[in-house]
Amino acid sequence: MDKMAKTLVFTGERQIELREYPIPEVSDNKVLVKVDACAICTWEQRVYTGVKKVEYPFIGGHEMVGKIIKMGKNVDRRQWSEGDFVAVGVTLPCKNCYQCKSGNEQNCEHFDHSKQQEGLPEKGMGGMSSHLLVSPDNLFHISNVSPEEATITEPLSCVLHSVETAQIEFGDVVVVIGCGIMGLLHTLLSIRRGACVIVSDTNEERTKLALELGASYAVNPAKENLEEKVKEITGGIKAQVVFDTTPISAVAEDAVKSVANNGRLVLYSSFYPDTPISISPDWLHKSAAKLLGTANSNTVDFTKATRLLSQGIIDVKPFVSEVYELEEYKQAFE
């Protein structure tokens, strides 16, 4: 067994270093996971470009999977074994605050990306490392997918929480604004819940993929008015659910126009910059529409996400665009 582990450390804007540190000793209640793959999330991209501010030095990575290679003496052997392939949850809820105790870990009052993790040389979530010490509470069995596909577990769990928050019903018309990976995952899950999905994006390569994945309609808002197209498709009723997966406040303000009476607008993305928007309170009163926010995921969502992938209910192969070795980090981030 190697004695040294490797990790990527953000040291400043557009500055990353590959560092070595001793592979941590396994404490009584933890397991040692050798990381097989970690996806680069938009969050880490924003840290890299300086849009998201963190205290340096910082270790990113929260979409990772790997194998258990060593277990502490108190770890339940009925549940875990060396060699198990696992998805790792490191969104780091405290599990003690009111929200966590109420089953809403995704809204933990003390949520902190920058905690110091046991065994790591710097603060951060730590997924962009070769080895991690993890509590079994944050491990989830996964099977029948490649490590690269399995890294989609965490984003899928977040989208699953979003879709369940929207309470989509069979026959609903759902508008998904933004066809990046999060928008495409919203598209897939909405279809699985029996919805007719309209996607909206100025990138027609992305909307083409959304149509291939099962979306019924695609709108390019640079060429067409989204509200008018939604009214045309729905006979004037508009959409029961609108998901905004973009980080742009103006898009969220415009998204309101496509929501039906008694419909739901779900704001999924973080907004950069966080510019206030204008919404008519009288429209909200008369339409009985609901404005909903959703962020992160909880243990239940993570468990469901691993089942969706392991059982082949959701195919995420189209979302694995490039694969890099840890040493190729500069190329990966650029």
Where are these regions (language model features)?
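C-terminal hydrophobic helical "lid"/dimerization subdomain
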Residues: 2-7, 253-257, 299-334
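Glycine-rich beta-strand-centered segment in the early N-terminal region that forms part
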Residues: 24-38, 51-101, 143-145
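Short, well-ordered loop/turn sites that connect or cap secondary structure elements
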Residues: 79-81, 168, 259
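Short glycine-centered segments of the SAM/dcSAM-binding site in methyltransferase folds
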Residues: 85, 173, 241, 263-264, ...
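NAD(P)H dinucleotide-binding glycine-rich loop of Rossmann-like/cofactor-binding domains
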Residues: 96-177
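Mid-domain Rossmann-like dinucleotide-binding core that forms the NAD(H)/NADP(H) cofactor-binding site
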Residues: 144-224, 228
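A glycine-rich helix->loop->beta "capping" turn
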Residues: 233-241
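Glycine-rich phosphate-binding loop and adjacent beta-alpha segment
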Residues: 249-311
